Amino acid sequence: NASMGGWQPGSAGVAIQASMGGGQPDGVTPTPTPTPTPTPTPGGPTAFAFQSETQNVMSASTAAGSPMRDALARRMDYAIRRSKASGAWGRKLARYVFSADSEAQQQINIRNPGTYNLTKVGTPTFTANDGITTAANTSYYDTGCPLTAVGRDDHSVEVYSLSATAGTLIDMGARDSAGVGISINSKATSATAVMQSYTAPASINPATAAHWTGSGWAGPHRNSGAAIDVTHHGIVVAPALASTSVATVGGENPTFRVLGVAGSTATTTRKLAGAYISAYLTPAQRAEEAAAWTDYTECARFGAPYIEEIGKGSATITADFVAYGCSLPSVIAAYDAARRGLTVAIIGDWADETIWDIGGTPSSGLTYIDAKVPAHVKGIFRDMLSWMNTISQARADTATQDGLSLTPRDYQRAIRRMLDPTRTQAATGSGLIVGQNVPVFMTGGLTAAAMTGTKITSITTADGRTVTGKVFFDGSYDGDLIRLAGVPYQIGREAAGTGNESAAGYRGAANNLKPQTSAGGTQLDIDPYVTPGSSASGRIYGVVADPGIADGAADPAGIQPLNKRLTWSNIVSRMAPLAVNSSPPAGYAASKYEIFGRIFAASTAASITYPIASLLKIDSTAGVFDVNNGEGRISTDALNSGLAYAAAGTSFPARKAVFDDVQSWISGLMYWLLYSGDARIPAALITSLQGYYLDPFCHLDPGSSGTPLFWPKNAYRREPLYLMKNASYKFDANDMDGNNRPDGSAPRSNKTVTTVSYALDVHSIRIMDTGGLVAIQGAVYNATTQYAGGVNFITPFPLEAIVPDASACTNLISSVSVSSSRLAYGSYRMEPTMGMAAEVAAAVAKNAIDNNIAVQAVDYPTVRSAALAAGDTIALTLTQVN
């Protein structure tokens, strides 16, 4: 078991977890015998141990009659480590989380249990996994922390509100009888907050228009006699506010209250989720604190998956169903397998490290759901969207483009709920995506797969774990398990074929494109040379030589470019600067963006104002935007990054270097546009960009990646390096030919596992020099009925394409690295399509395990019936005709 260095399924399918010095596994009856110290495999992961600070909180919780859940305690341990790493932990006097499992837990001062614990006065209301409220100024929680415990010129105090109520309210504070002290009103009017910082009441009134929504972290900070600044959700929004009076406090020395303040009849009608009292924290520390403790609070509120970090915990892991990669398909497959009674484990790939990596690309910003027919999105993913719409977004649940789009924050909430077995219908009041026992192990990636005949018996991870399973699922975005299992695979584009596949292979010459001013707009001739007209001067950044591949020939390096799907908002209350502190990011050089300067100059010369839609595709979900490559063709897709990723091959460090280049490209582009002062940049474009901000409620944990806060950590990989290459069946663009395979006709296979509903959409492979002009090579987009599934825009996708040939491997499934042509994959690659196939994959795995047969030998009608009866609110359709 885990206490001996390994993880195996425990009673009732619940993980027995390696909780060194910590709490009991969730759902497992505690045993009176002590937990032995695990013995890690030599060279493998080290034993996990809670920090002493976390142990103190856990001991205090147990003493209060409310032991902490192990999975949630691990998330607290992680938040404390982040706080210590920033230097904020040592400066804090008190840290409270009101969204706890019990009132006894929420009263504990996490920073120093036993000192400044909350005392309940009157009858404030505590709601488990939510927050605290009050109906009267006589009902509150007293911290016991005196005002003078923080220095007049050395303090940071913040409160975390979940409500948008405005009024003459006090969320938290300490005042003497003269009204002097520290207090926070997170929202006084629609545009203002009222705070004081050892000053007379209302002496600070940061009236940034429409900034103060009442929700998020807010509070005053002071580190000198006259300079006070105010922070909202980790971002300084009112810097260096001059105080008209620097007041002193008399002998009363009142204590800080939460849900009110001494000496005032004002109270608050807002719901509060947390607070802290500290010596002065720097702006960087505040941002990190807001991110770390918001992330922890979200786990307390919506769900805390059991997560083992890279190199810590179980040396051996055993489960019936093992999903590799933290993608949405892996989550859905593991979730449904657990729902079907199998023991499961998700094993992180090389790019997976933090909780924000779980769920894959939607967690990393891809939240505007692409589907020609939104109603084709069904099953678990549709239930996730329904839950997000009704519970998290509180909006109408509709099968429309907008109704099926989401925000990374809402999506993360759904993921956390799904992977926490304590999130039952009874506990939450919702029957949607009820939590299952799905542990996650971050590993640094795979290094080997052990085979017995055609069966994978175990896999080995980069951090030295051995994972044994009965059926394996490759949900990674690279297809590494496909490769390591010896399954034939395809890298890059195959040569052109017949019919719709004539658009495959290397597309040059007549198929090359130019930069353009807008979709269908003016095509621009852009010189590719450092000195225009002089090839001897070399090419500008991002332009490569023509590779000399014959038109239609195979293109082994033909991988679509990588991107980062940024999460922006134009709501002022959700503001984090696009280029923080106006400082150039690592690797920045203005010369990298010369191609944009020339595009803008050519547009101006053509009397065209280059619109922001040409630069960036900005799609909205409730005021939060998914930012993608724009209509002008050269945009946030990192130039030629697919070529670099193909060249990186099996090297994880080389892949990470490409990720870093993508981050540098996009963050540098934002800096160049906003701050370089290049005269060629249209003023209107700068003005448009100034209306957007990074959303500080998303992308809260960059881990060790070096990515700044509020930027997505992982790059968007549009296609795997390694696609399954079956001899028996390969889905291709002709399967989507609505002319030769019209609606209602029979597909090549009727063993449907998902439906495809999108255009052939392949982004450019190369930005290159062709005849002294910049050419955009490799792009394909065709949304006609011929190429996108006929009039109904729906194409069935079969079982034979998600399992390898039986001669290669008999216990492996993938709904990501499927057996498909690269061209057809341009339509298949949408997250809902892969997610629905993953749900059926779980039914396939269950059938194969129960009958001890190969995944290729399952009885499809039985699998189909099981998938349709899965209990989803909107069941899968699995149409068997075109």
Residue spans of the language-model regions?
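Acidic glycine-/aspartate-rich tracts in secreted/extracellular proteins
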Residues: 99-104, 224-226, 278-285
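Flavin (FAD/FMN)-binding glycine-rich loop and adjacent Rossmann-like elements that form
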Residues: 361, 465-471, 475-882
